[in-house]
From Swiss-Prot:
Modification sites for N6-(pyridoxal phosphate)lysine: K198
The organism's taxonomic lineage, starting at the top: Bacteria, Pseudomonadati, Pseudomonadota, Gammaproteobacteria, Candidatus Palibaumannia
Protein's UniProt name: Phosphoserine aminotransferase
Keyword flag Thylakoid: no
Pathway(s) served: Amino-acid biosynthesis; L-serine biosynthesis; L-serine from 3-phospho-D-glycerate: step 2/3; Cofactor biosynthesis; pyridoxine 5'-phosphate biosynthesis; pyridoxine 5'-phosphate from D-erythrose 4-phosphate: step 3/5
Function description: Catalyzes the reversible conversion of 3-phosphohydroxypyruvate to phosphoserine and of 3-hydroxy-2-oxo-4-phosphonooxybutanoate to phosphohydroxythreonine.
Cellular component GO terms held in the UniProt record: cytoplasm
MF term (GO), any: O-phospho-L-serine:2-oxoglutarate aminotransferase activity
Keywords, ordered alphabetically: Amino-acid biosynthesis, Aminotransferase, Cytoplasm, Pyridoxal phosphate, Pyridoxine biosynthesis, Serine biosynthesis, Transferase
Free-text remark on how the cofactor is bound: Binds 1 pyridoxal phosphate per subunit.
Assembly and interaction partners: Homodimer.
Originating species: Baumannia cicadellinicola subsp. Homalodisca coagulata
Reaction catalyzed: O-phospho-L-serine + 2-oxoglutarate = 3-phosphooxypyruvate + L-glutamate; 4-(phosphooxy)-L-threonine + 2-oxoglutarate = (R)-3-hydroxy-2-oxo-4-phosphooxybutanoate + L-glutamate
Length: 363
């Protein structure tokens, strides 16, 4: 089989070692004669999977003891609703930092449950797009329920690497496309949530990391049980049947990350991949990227051809060369390469060589 490199932004590439282990165990998991997909989530065997998954994630992210880890249904879009429904309390106002498509989408969903105050932080300087430094963000007074932002915008290719320092405000972050890509200080956040299908595992699962004090006396009485953080925490994420296969594969990914050397090594690899691709774009007149270097995402690299009439041909020839899912999002156009943890440096080198060859032939 020819080597294929999948640059999809999600569902995204999984580590080949994880896929091979899941394949090997699929029909006879741990000698039980049955699949992991068929055993009860309340069995001792699956409870061990759940326990190890949580402990490995805690180890990777250095999650403090006063935080709960929830394995939830529904991906990040479900959390767009769950966050305000769980956290509003007496205040019906929340600050939403508008740094791109997904932060705007979160605010739009939250509007059904609260009054989101949109804080514009995007900047445009001589055709370059970027994000204002946090010190320039004009937040609401202290009576807001929380401050929500998205550290990495997959469609826009924008990242916010600064750690939030907003005093006593509760900070909520959508880390869907940045979780496990580098070390983070979890204690700076009240809630971190992330859909699985980018850097964690298969689609259908979301992980929520929430500080203990935010589980008490905040949730709306009309909150659906499946979205109730306190109820999920009290039942160890098993109030109802969880997405067990996605949970299991995510656990394998956590173990794979530890074998790679943890998040310090993962960050080095991710930066090396992104720098190689950005340098190729910047040193070419055939391709361009309009994001300020300080705000360029290391996970999602959008780029454009100077001659957009060649876009479709680029996609076709790239796929023929084993480079999949490079077409940009429908709202942004152009190209986009997702460089999540499972993408090897070899994949980016292959993409860069293809880009050189394509530019030589059509430039």
């Amino acid at each position: 089989m020819n080597t294929v490199f999948n640059f999809s932004s999600g569902p995204a590439k999984l580590p080949i070692e994880v896929l091979q282990q899941a394949q090997q165990e699929l029909c006879n998991w741990h000698g039980l004669g049955t699949s992991i997909m068929e055993i009860s989530h309340r069995s001792d065997e699956f409870r061990q999977v759940a326990y190890e998954s949580e402990q490995d994630l805690r180890s990777l992210l250095n999650i403090p003891d006063n935080y709960q880890v929830l394995f939830c249904h529904g991906g990040a879009r479900a959390q767009f609703a769950a966050v305000p429904m769980n956290l509003l309390g007496k205040s019906k106002i929340a600050d939403y930092i508008h740094g791109g498509y997904w932060s705007y989408s979160a605010a739009k969903e939250a509007h059904k449950y609260c009054q989101p105050r949109m804080i514009e932080v995007m900047t445009y300087i001589n055709g370059w797009r970027g994000i204002k430094p946090m010190v320039e963000w004009v937040l609401s007074p202290d009576n807001v329920a929380y401050v929500h932002y998205c550290p990495n915008e997959t469609i826009d290719g924008l990242t916010i690497d600064e750690l939030p320092d907003f005093g006593n405000k509760i900070v909520v972050a959508d880390f869907s496309s940045a979780i496990l890509a580098r070390p983070i200080d979890v204690s700076k956040y009240g809630v971190i949530y992330a859909s699985a299908q980018k850097n964690i595992g298969p689609a259908g699962l979301a992980i929520v990391i929430i500080r203990d004090d935010l589980l008490i006396n905040r949730a709306s009485t009309k909150l659906p049980s499946i979205l109730n953080y306190q109820l999920l925490a009290n039942n160890k994420s098993m109030f109802n049947t969880p997405p067990t296969f996605a949970w299991y594969v995510s656990g394998l990914v956590f173990k794979w990350l530890k074998v790679q050397g943890g998040l310090v090594e993962i960050e080095k690899n991710n930066r090396a991949k992104a720098i190689l691709l950005y340098n190729t774009i910047d040193n070419s007149e055939f391709y361009y990227n309009n994001i300020l270097p300080v705000n360029r995402s290391y996970m999602n690299v959008p780029f454009y051809l100077a001659n957009s009439a060649l876009d479709d041909l680029f996609i076709i020839e790239a796929r023929n060369a084993g480079l999949y899912a490079l077409k940009g999002h429908r709202v942004a156009g152009g190209m986009r390469a997702a460089l999540y943890n499972a993408m090897p440096l070899e994949g980016v080198k292959t993409l860069v060589q293809f880009m050189h060859n394509f530019a030589c032939r059509y430039g």
